[in-house]
């Protein structure tokens, strides 16, 4: 079988991914010109490289259209309801670190934990005539964390199409769930992360689609071993 590996198409994610594969003995070159979205591994037959956006990689891995992909754990877990059953997080690659967090306005002085936020949510409708509004691009992770992990049910999700951190100030939401690397943007928008409000500590991962034909395939095993040895 031909093994397809999806790698980020641009930016630091592309550079870091290519560097790890090169350390693993798999030098990747573009097929055609430097802007091509296809590539190959020098000296290795039956391996195809496709360059996609990080979100596209998460989707293609989930559907089984590619065998391996390098993308953020947050994108995979947000995109797939049963991520661990459908894919294997085969290796954590040590770059692209960012946390998916719950952040509330700094002026909410007495709200520091998810339990505090649960109390606010329970009281919010009586006080304001509506449910607590959460702006996010991560609706699945938000629901799992609020309803599944903390038993908070009285909220509504507002889809964020732009800069999520600006939603409370604009009045489109009360709090946010967003991804952050340093927290500086949250602070600039007068938001604070709850003490137990880290939903996921994400980073770039080598992700493998769980396929029956991968079992006992020496090329699959070789790729896994090579990448892990390069970390």
Swiss-Prot record:
Superkingdom of the organism of origin: Bacteria
Pathway per the UniProt entry: Amino-acid biosynthesis; L-histidine biosynthesis; L-histidine from 5-phospho-alpha-D-ribose 1-diphosphate: step 1/9
Keywords: Amino-acid biosynthesis, ATP-binding, Cytoplasm, Glycosyltransferase, Histidine biosynthesis, Nucleotide-binding, Transferase
One Pfam family here: HisG
GO annotation terms (biological process): L-histidine biosynthetic process
UniProt cross-references to InterPro entries, sorted A to Z: ATP_PRibTrfase_cat, ATP_PRibTrfase_CS, ATP_PRibTrfase_HisG, ATP_PRibTrfase_HisG_short
Catalytic activity: 1-(5-phospho-beta-D-ribosyl)-ATP + diphosphate = 5-phospho-alpha-D-ribose 1-diphosphate + ATP
Broad class of enzyme this protein falls into: transferase
EC number(s) stated in the UniProt entry for this protein: 2.4.2.17
Protein's cellular compartments: Cytoplasm
CC annotations in GO: cytoplasm
Molecular function as annotated in GO: ATP binding; ATP phosphoribosyltransferase activity
Domain notes: Lacks the C-terminal regulatory region which is replaced by HisZ.
UniProt subunit comment: Heteromultimer composed of HisG and HisZ subunits.
Similarity annotation: Belongs to the ATP phosphoribosyltransferase family. Short subfamily.
Matching NCBIfam families: hisG
Role this protein plays: Catalyzes the condensation of ATP and 5-phosphoribose 1-diphosphate to form N'-(5'-phosphoribosyl)-ATP (PR-ATP). Has a crucial role in the pathway because the rate of histidine biosynthesis seems to be controlled primarily by regulation of HisG enzymatic activity.
Protein name from the UniProt record: ATP phosphoribosyltransferase
């Amino acid at each position: 079988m031909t093994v397809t590996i999806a790698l980020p198409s641009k930016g630091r994610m592309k550079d870091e991914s290519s560097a790890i594969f090169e350390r693993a003995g798999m030098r990747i070159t573009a097929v055609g010109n430097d802007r091509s979205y296809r590539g190959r591994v020098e000296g290795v037959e039956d391996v195809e490289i496709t360059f996609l956006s990080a979100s596209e990689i998460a989707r293609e891995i989930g559907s089984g259209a590619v065998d391996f992909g390098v993308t953020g754990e947050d994108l995979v877990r947000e995109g797939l309801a049963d991520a661990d059953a459908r894919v294997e997080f085969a290796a954590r690659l040590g770059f692209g670190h960012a946390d998916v967090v719950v952040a509330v306005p700094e002026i909410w002085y007495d709200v520091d934990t998810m339990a505090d936020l649960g109390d606010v949510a329970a009281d919010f409708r009586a006080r304001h005539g509506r449910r607590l509004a959460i702006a996010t691009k991560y609706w699945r992770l938000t629901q799992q964390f609020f309803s599944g992990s903390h038993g908070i049910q009285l909220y509504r999700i507002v889809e964020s199409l732009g800069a999520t951190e600006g939603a409370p100030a604009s009045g489109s939401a009360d709090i946010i769930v967003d991804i952050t690397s340093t927290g500086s943007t949250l602070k600039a928008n007068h938001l604070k992360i709850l003490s137990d409000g880290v939903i996921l500590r994400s980073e770039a991962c080598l992700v493998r689609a769980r396929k029956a034909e991968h079992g006992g395939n020496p090329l699959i095993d070789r790729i896994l071993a090579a990448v892990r040895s390069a970390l």
